[in-house]
Amino acid sequence: MNTPHKLLIIDDNKEILSALKDFFTRKSYEVFSAADGLEGLKILETERQSFDLVITDLVMPNISGVALISIIKKRFPDTPVIAITGWGEHPEALATEAQADKVLEKPFELSELDRLIKDLLPPV
């Protein structure tokens, strides 16, 4: 039996976090979630490089998504990161600066995010 892909989703918007967690759990992913960058970083450190992909908001309290992505890319360089954001005039520039693999602007369709994940991860 194949092991499901393991995702970490980080967003300070509770509704978005809940919707993403529910959607990807139904899609048979193993989903962990965090309400801010600091909590996300703690989960990453606890799980020790076992995430297949991280989805993070860019604008959050404690540790911004931009800073978090930079940390992830230094500590876990093989882990793809998708940045999601609804703020700023140039979200692509922020995500590129932080070295996100993909960026998605809010609002977005869940199917669009699912497609990006499938593009970044091998089939299970």
Regions found by a protein language model. Name each.
Residues 11, 57:
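Active-site residues of response regulator receiver
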Residues 14-32:
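Two-component/phosphorelay signaling modules centered on CheY-like receiver
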Residues 33-53:
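Acidic, metal-coordinating helix/loop segments flanking the phosphotransfer/catalytic sites
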Residues 60:
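Receiver (REC) domain active-site loop signature in two-component systems and cognate sites
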Residues 108-118:
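C-terminal output helix
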Residues 67, 87-104, 115:
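Alpha4 helix (beta4-alpha4-beta5 surface) of REC/receiver domains from two-component response regulators
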Residues 36-39, 64-68:
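Acidic catalytic/metal-coordinating carboxylates
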